[in-house]
Every structure is written in C-alpha cells, then in structure tokens.
Amino acid sequence: MLPAQEFANAITILFPAFTTALLAFETKNTMVTIILIGTLMHTPVSFTYHLLAGLGRHADRIDNDLRRLDQTMQHVAIVLFTFATSGSVFYTTLCCKFNAYYIFRLWHPKTTNDGRRFIPINIAAHFYMLPLLWRADYRNFLIAFESFWFGGFFFTPCINRDYFGGWGHCVFHLALSIHGYALVASIMDAS
C-alpha cells in the first residue's frame, strides 16, 4: 500500500467519528453516546496505525502490535455498539465473551496474520445489527447491513488490490459513516 493510501485511510477513519459525534450532540441520547464512545475508543488507534504505516514505521505493516490494538479496539467498540442497539445486558455479555476470546487470540504469541483475523470482527459486527431486525426496523437494518458490506466489498484484500489499487480501505471507512447513521436512526426510532 502506498503512503498516500495509508494517509487517506487515516483521514477517512475520522469521518465516522465526526458523523457519530454530531448525531450524539444533536440527539443527546444515552445509547447514541455509547456508540460515540465506542467509535472514539477505536478512532485514535486506527488513525495512528494508518499514519505510522504511511510513514513506514512498521517493520510489517499488517502483523504488528499497533494493528493488533486497532483490531482489539474494533472488538471493544462492537461490544459497546451491541449494548447501544440492544439495551440487553445478557445479549451484550454473550457478545463480550465472543469478542474477549478473539481479543485474547489476537495477542497470543502464536497468532500470526494469516489473512483471517478480520473474520471474527465481521461476525461480531452482526451482533449489534441483529437487534435492529428483532425490533422489525428493516429499513435501518438494511442500510446498516448494506453499507457495511458495500464498504467491506471494496476492503476485501484481493478486490482492493486488483481492482481498486489499494484505495478500497478508504471507501470502507466512508461507508461506516452511513452505517453509523443507520444505527443511530434505529436507536432513535426505538426510543
């Protein structure tokens, strides 16, 4: 990946944070604020990871501790998002157990980047989208689901590399703004 692409990744990860912050301040809803907290826990780590990758500071751009911390914070944000969309302590506890297991695996000395570390994150992201279905909020579920997978399509390593020249990660970050908006809209509709 080119330095310019990593710098663009660092900038575009700020968009979901700005979107969520504006919505949290506008709605003054506790659950939306929890979404913001999860987003703000992940954003500085992701921004730093991409910035340092752009500066060539990682011996291995993919398999390094800052990348593991970035993925760890994604798992943490997912747990917070799950509580925000479900309001269920029981369901959030189940999600927390799943994510804690995969956080442990991320940091285990024998874990390497075999190209599959993103799979548990993708699975876990559906935990916080399912409550939208449970309350029959089909419109916001479809927007959240489709924006997640639309961005994810561009971020898929072989597609990103072969068809988008490495710029697909930026598209994923931008799609997360739409994704976050749909989550907030669902929370507000349920309030």
Q: What are the language-model segments listed below?
A:
Residues 1-191:
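Multi-pass alpha-helical transmembrane bundles in non-GPCR membrane proteins
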